[in-house]
């Protein structure tokens, strides 16, 4: 009798251990809810001036075309919201991280990531944010947001992310 009970409990434990986390919808918009866009997951209860607040209020990332570092009109709108957010919190400093997809050499992508981060910084400075509050770093292709070799993965990895220090 005890053997059967232990066997059933063991089977239930194995089934519970096999459950998976909910998946995000593939092919969703890179700037959609939960991806650092305004109104994303966690917009409630965000500590004012925190990374979570930046993500919920303004969005923390902009995306780039392949092998490009120019700011699109959509990215310009996000950066204007980031500048407004930074004006509300004048003691906050941020780091702008430049990222690339996996194509290209490590050296080339580090330089491209730096150009992307610098392009974002230049826009924020032009919008009145002191350069002393903004630092840049390039991670090239070393820190992908999405692992994969599809166009969707590439598009989400070509980005600049603003992080609160």
Question: What is each stretch, according to the model?
Answer:
Residues 1-8:
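Bacterial N-terminal signal peptides that target proteins for export
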Residues 14-17:
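C-terminal motif of bacterial Sec signal peptides marking the signal peptidase cleavage site
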Residues 19-93:
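Periplasmic peptidoglycan-binding/tethering modules of Gram-negative envelope proteins
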Residues 74-81, 107, 111, 115, ...:
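Extracytoplasmic/secreted proteins, especially bacterial periplasmic and envelope-associated proteins
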Residues 91-99, 114-145, 158-165:
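A non-catalytic structural micro-motif
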Residues 147-150:
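Short beta-alpha junctions and helix-cap segments that line functional grooves
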Residues 152-156:
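A generic structural micro-feature
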């Amino acid at each position: 009798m005890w053997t059967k009970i232990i066997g059933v409990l063991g089977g239930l434990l194995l089934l519970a251990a096999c459950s998976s986390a909910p998946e995000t919808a593939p092919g969703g918009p890179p700037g959609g809810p939960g991806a650092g866009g305004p109104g994303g997951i966690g917009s409630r209860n965000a500590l004012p001036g925190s990374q979570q607040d930046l993500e919920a209020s303004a969005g923390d990332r902009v995306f780039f075309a392949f092998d490009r570092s120019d700011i699109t009109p959509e990215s310009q709108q996000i950066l204007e919201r980031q500048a407004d957010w930074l004006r509300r919190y004048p003691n906050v400093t941020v780091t702008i991280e430049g990222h690339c997809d996996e194509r290209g050499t490590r050296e080339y992508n580090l330089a491209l990531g730096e150009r992307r981060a610098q392009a974002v910084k230049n826009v924020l400075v032009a919008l009145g944010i002191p350069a002393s509050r903004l630092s840049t770093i390039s991670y090239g292709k070393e820190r992908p947001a999405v692992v994969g070799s599809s166009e969707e993965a590439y598009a989400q990895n070509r980005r600049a992310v603003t992080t609160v220090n």
